[in-house]
Amino acid sequence: MIVKWGDILDSRANYSYVAQVNICKTSEFFKYNITYPVLKLYDKYVYHDMYDREIIININNEICEDVMEFKNSVKKQAIAYKKRYTEKLSKSDEDYVKYQYEVYINNEVTYDRNNIISIVMTKYEFTGGAHGMTYLDAYNYNLLTGDRLTLKDMFKPGVDYEEIVNNFIKEEINNKPENYFKGDEGFKGISENQPFYIDEDGIVIYFGLYEIAPYYIGIPKFKLKFDEFNKYLNYN
């Protein structure tokens, strides 16, 4: 699928805007605080022939379903932990560590024009142990078609984007090799469904915690700046 961005120097505002929904709750063994985005059409475009309301509905449903699936997965673990904790406490005089399972989700709209939107969701879970885990989920859409964009879509047809991106990341890693795993645990190349998001000046490739670097490094990110990679990218 070809992405029709439009010239970034002559950008066009999208026909939709992003509202935020917050849900939160605290109980004995589980708490969550979640803010997730909801796309809405500007009033003047609600009945415009060019824009399909179903596209917005489908995008919102996909994002909401992902958020609830993440929350409910941790909630299910919290229920199981509560049962184990209660059973142990009733059978022993010993003290057991009691803690809450936690979910925090927030988001940032990093790009929103030229019929393209990019939203980065930061998801955190704590399920016991030394620390919680943080995940990034990026939602990149063509708002005219409803298609969820892949990294390949960002590049012109015929461009070997995998080679370009892999070489760039390898160069960045070589600049600070002490920050990354080596050998079999290190970076071997981007995946077919490589996560990324778009911001105002580039395309950000990212990896999960522990994927190519130690936990203390955080989520590794590598930005292909528009002004450096423009000749490869899929602009009109």
PLM regions and their residue ranges:
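Compositionally biased intrinsically disordered regions enriched in Thr/Gly
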Residues: 2-236
